[in-house]
């Protein structure tokens, strides 16, 4: 078994549309364990730190504006190959191209407002978790 942790964000559009419970339920039903969960509003500084890998790209400013436009849900999920499992569950970035049955395929018609974010590698997961969560907010059980 290759137990991993990954970070998932339910973005402001997902929160606004009342999709929190549905999205969390999908991950739980898959067998992923929630290690941390909170609602927060990203500051501009925190959003820029989180998305620093995209700094300088044409969409960076609009991404930061979107991610700071309302509350988000942040969670750490753990399970066997959690990173790739979650990535398959959420689907491709562009909701218009995401297959039905994936979170983005079922709930997004956009590339920019695509309901969820998930870490794409173990290194990204570690960095992103450190940006969003303090050590004492992560529960081992």
Curated annotation (Swiss-Prot):
<dbReference type="InterPro" id="IPR023005">
    <property type="entry name" value="Nucleoside_diP_kinase_AS"/>
</dbReference>
<dbReference type="GO" id="GO:0005737">
    <property type="term" value="C:cytoplasm"/>
</dbReference>
<keyword id="KW-0418">Kinase</keyword>
<keyword id="KW-0963">Cytoplasm</keyword>
<dbReference type="GO" id="GO:0006183">
    <property type="term" value="P:GTP biosynthetic process"/>
</dbReference>
<feature type="binding site">
    <location>
        <position position="114"/>
    </location>
    <ligand>
        <name>ATP</name>
    </ligand>
</feature>
<comment type="similarity">
    <text>Belongs to the NDK family.</text>
</comment>
<dbReference type="GO" id="GO:0004550">
    <property type="term" value="F:nucleoside diphosphate kinase activity"/>
</dbReference>
<feature type="binding site">
    <location>
        <position position="87"/>
    </location>
    <ligand>
        <name>ATP</name>
    </ligand>
</feature>
<keyword id="KW-0460">Magnesium</keyword>
<keyword id="KW-0597">Phosphoprotein</keyword>
<keyword id="KW-0808">Transferase</keyword>
<feature type="active site" description="Pros-phosphohistidine intermediate">
    <location>
        <position position="117"/>
    </location>
</feature>
<dbReference type="GO" id="GO:0006241">
    <property type="term" value="P:CTP biosynthetic process"/>
</dbReference>
<feature type="binding site">
    <location>
        <position position="59"/>
    </location>
    <ligand>
        <name>ATP</name>
    </ligand>
</feature>
<dbReference type="InterPro" id="IPR036850">
    <property type="entry name" value="NDK-like_dom_sf"/>
</dbReference>
<feature type="binding site">
    <location>
        <position position="93"/>
    </location>
    <ligand>
        <name>ATP</name>
    </ligand>
</feature>
<dbReference type="Pfam" id="PF00334">
    <property type="entry name" value="NDK"/>
</dbReference>
<keyword id="KW-0547">Nucleotide-binding</keyword>
<keyword id="KW-0479">Metal-binding</keyword>
<keyword id="KW-0546">Nucleotide metabolism</keyword>
<dbReference type="GO" id="GO:0005524">
    <property type="term" value="F:ATP binding"/>
</dbReference>
<feature type="binding site">
    <location>
        <position position="11"/>
    </location>
    <ligand>
        <name>ATP</name>
    </ligand>
</feature>
<feature type="binding site">
    <location>
        <position position="104"/>
    </location>
    <ligand>
        <name>ATP</name>
    </ligand>
</feature>
<dbReference type="GO" id="GO:0006228">
    <property type="term" value="P:UTP biosynthetic process"/>
</dbReference>
<dbReference type="InterPro" id="IPR001564">
    <property type="entry name" value="Nucleoside_diP_kinase"/>
</dbReference>
<comment type="function">
    <text>Major role in the synthesis of nucleoside triphosphates other than ATP. The ATP gamma phosphate is transferred to the NDP beta phosphate via a ping-pong mechanism, using a phosphorylated active-site intermediate.</text>
</comment>
<protein>
    <recommendedName>
        <fullName>Nucleoside diphosphate kinase</fullName>
        <ecNumber>2.7.4.6</ecNumber>
    </recommendedName>
</protein>
<keyword id="KW-0067">ATP-binding</keyword>
<dbReference type="GO" id="GO:0046872">
    <property type="term" value="F:metal ion binding"/>
</dbReference>
<dbReference type="InterPro" id="IPR034907">
    <property type="entry name" value="NDK-like_dom"/>
</dbReference>
